Every structure is written in C-alpha cells, then in structure tokens.
Amino acid sequence: MTPKEEFISIFKENITRPGGDKLLHWLEGSDFFIAPASTRFHGNHEGGLVEHSLQVYKCLLGELDTVDLKTRYTNETVAIVGLLHDICKTNFYVKGFRNVKENGVWVQKEVYEIKDNFPIGHAEKSVIMLQNFMKLDADEIYAIRAHMGAFDCAFKGGDQFLNNIFNQCPLALLLHLSDMKATYIYE
C-alpha cells in the first residue's frame, strides 16, 4: 500500500463527520500527497508530507497507549489531529533552483521553496483550513494549535499559551511529542 492509499484508508475509516468527504476530495485535488514536509529538513522530498502525517498519526496512537488515554479521545479526533496537523503545508511549496558546490564545482540543484499565499501562521493556518471543511472540537483545536511546541514563533516571542494548553489538553502535548518523535527519530 502506498502512503497515499494508507492515508486515504485511515481517513475514510475514522473521519466521518460532516465535511470530511469534501476535505478528502480537496486533498486529492491538491499537492498534499506529493508535497514535501519541509524545504531542507525532515521529509524534504516528494511525498514527504503524507509520510510525515502518517508517522505522526502512528506515534500518537502509541503515545495514547503509553499514558492510557486512548479511550479519552475518539478514533476520529486522533485521526484528525495526527493526519491533518500540517495541512497548512498543502499548496505551500514550489520547486525552484539553488546553486550548490559539489566536489568543488557549482551546479544548479532543484530545491523546494516556500510560497505562502495565506501567511497567517503555521498551526493557526491548519486550524483555519480544517474548519473551512468541518467543525473541530476544542481539544482538536488546542492540539493542532500547540503541535509546534517551543518551535512556535508566538512561544519564542514570550506567549505563554503552551503551558495553558498542555495543562488543559493532554492530547495537545501528546501530538507535539508525536510530531517531534516522527521528525527526529523516524524521519
């Protein structure tokens, strides 16, 4: 099964709320399944975004088991936050070129560049994009909003929202840990 097929299977099996079908149709018409997860770091290759999304989802399932919280959240909620936390990266990257030196010779190398047509912020954009298709509950919003943890620009600027969210919503902390585990251990 390809990553795209696996993603669609998990999505259809778990995400059944109104608007989910329209969201999946939109994803299939977008670059979600071929987009990279980043320009230079984890998953910076074609299909990296869907691979990362699947890995975060799988890590989240494991984290929920580890702390015995699996029954606190529905399969749908876990699938939404795990698979779709980075939906903001859809239609976000374009291919470009950069000059790099290889063996003492300058060569032109194809790279991914950012083209942000909706510069509202990473996690905020994911929440907004998802809510254009379906209603999210508070825990889903908290988890997606806080999934960047201390890498979030608002936190770096001194905002204390993370402490409040992590204290109120264990799912948010577990999604953040799953994102970090996927990024730094598995990818």
Predicted regions and their residues:
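Non-catalytic interface/linker regions that flank or bridge core catalytic/transmembrane domains
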Residues: 1-35
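Amphipathic alpha-helical segments within well-ordered protein domains
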Residues: 8, 12, 57, 61, ...
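Generic signature of intrinsically disordered, low-complexity segments enriched in small/polar residues
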Residues: 10, 14, 35-36, 60, ...
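Generic detector of short, locally flexible boundary/turn motifs and exposed helical patches
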Residues: 21-23, 44-46, 106-110
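A glycine-rich, hydrophobic loop/mini-helix early in the fold
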Residues: 26-74
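Divalent metal-dependent catalytic cores for phosphoryl transfer on phosphate-bearing substrates
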Residues: 39-41, 51, 68-187
